[in-house]
Amino acid sequence: MRAAALALLFPLMAHAIDVQGHRGARGLLPENTLPAFARALELGVTTLELDTGVTRDRVVVVHHDRRLNPDTARGPDGRWIDAPGPAIHSLSFEELQRYDVGRLRPGSAYAKRFPHQQPLDGVRIPALKDLFSLAEKDKAIRFNIETKISPEAPHETLPPG
């Protein structure tokens, strides 16, 4: 009897579980990138979790930190950037697109944490609108969006409002 009741309830419980793709599928592909979000959708997540910043020219972009991360970003010359990386709000969207965020710096704590992440050279930080375009095929997908605008770090973000 108990097993039968659980069998009847399981389909209802499955719809109640929110499976989030944290920064896309960052254990598999470069975090907060369109390929990572596409993989998360392929895997059947119900919510895409992401972080946003705003560039100098007011483009909302998908990126976890208020600054480019030296463990995930390489400059136009292909070299890893130095810490601290430039603040997202100090760059135009065009300038931001010069940075490659498709792999983890070898030997970094990030690389050790995600040893199975597949590198993808040439991957850029996406605009939020591009993520919405990617996800629009799945009408049931939800978003968990954290903004990286902070009154506690006015030198690193645009002002709230």
Identify the meaning behind each predicted range:
Residues 3-13:
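Sec-dependent N-terminal signal peptides
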Residues 12-161:
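Phosphate-group recognition and catalysis centered on beta-loop-alpha active-site segments
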